[in-house]
């Protein structure tokens, strides 16, 4: 992400102003503003506990990855608002991820080059092998933003930025913007944070730890090129989340997940 400040054009509502009418700010009606993306390549997003040699992947993007995709795309479209205000607004918004109909994970061993433990002598990089997982997603990904928790100006900003998003996380997990819409309620195909609620996943669900913007998230802290350190529970939080994808089939080198039938 280029480290620069976007110029301000016009006046935006302050981040503290909440949407008094959850159906305002975007065409159609409904509390949830939902963006739909079609995966065009294999998806991979390492779990928070993954190591460089064992790269297990999540099945879906996290809220953090979705929000960072909007921040990155804001630079691409030369968005005329303040990036700092966008990050602060996204930090306050509840986001749910709509899962695809099916996900197939391939388990692979690949050759990589990594820095040696002794960096003072020898080559800068040495050959090694690593475990990697990649996901084939059958169906669209949907990102639902709760407008009742958003500043009034955010809906229009997201709609302007959304078409410029073409990858998730690190470059490689490419997606194609399909469109957006509004819904009053979300269906069972969307993630649900546990937040202390005792829910037992059924055969068509699983619990995963997904990250999100923290309450004090700022562009300076989240920017990879900034010297400001990112702090857990302040700038970035991790939440146990119910993901409506359950294991339905396993075989040599793959695992298949699907939404609960019906």
Question: Would you name each region that the model predicts?
Answer:
Residues 2-262:
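Conserved active-site/ligand-binding neighborhood in enzyme cores
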């Amino acid at each position: 992400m280029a480290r620069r400040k976007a110029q301000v054009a016009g006046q935006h509502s302050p981040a503290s102003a909440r949407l008094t009418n959850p159906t305002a700010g975007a065409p159609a009606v409904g509390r949830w503003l939902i963006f739909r993306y079609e995966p065009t390549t294999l998806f991979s997003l390492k779990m928070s506990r993954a190591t460089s040699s064992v790269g297990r992947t999540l099945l879906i993007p996290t809220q953090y990855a979705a929000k960072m995709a909007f921040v990155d795309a804001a630079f691409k479209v030369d968005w005329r608002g303040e990036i700092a205000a966008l990050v602060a607004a996204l930090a306050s918004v509840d986001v749910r991820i709509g899962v695809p109909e099916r996900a197939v994970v391939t388990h692979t061993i690949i050759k990589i080059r990594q820095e040696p433990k002794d960096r003072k002598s020898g080559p800068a990089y040495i050959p090694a092998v690593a475990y990697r997982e990649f996901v084939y997603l059958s169906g669209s990904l949907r990102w639902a933003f709760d407008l009742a928790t958003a500043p009034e100006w955010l809906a229009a900003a997201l709609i302007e930025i959304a078409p410029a998003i073409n990858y998730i996380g690190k470059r490689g997990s490419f997606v194609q913007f399909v469109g957006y819409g509004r819904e009053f309620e979300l269906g069972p195909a969307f993630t649900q944070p546990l937040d202390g609620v005792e829910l037992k996943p059924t055969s068509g669900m699983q619990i995963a730890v997904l990250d999100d913007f923290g309450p004090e998230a700022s562009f300076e802290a989240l920017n990879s090129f900034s010297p400001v350190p990112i702090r857990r529970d302040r700038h970035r939080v991790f939440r146990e989340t119910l993901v409506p994808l359950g294991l339905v089939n396993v075989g040599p080198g793959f695992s298949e997940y699907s939404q609960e039938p019906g």
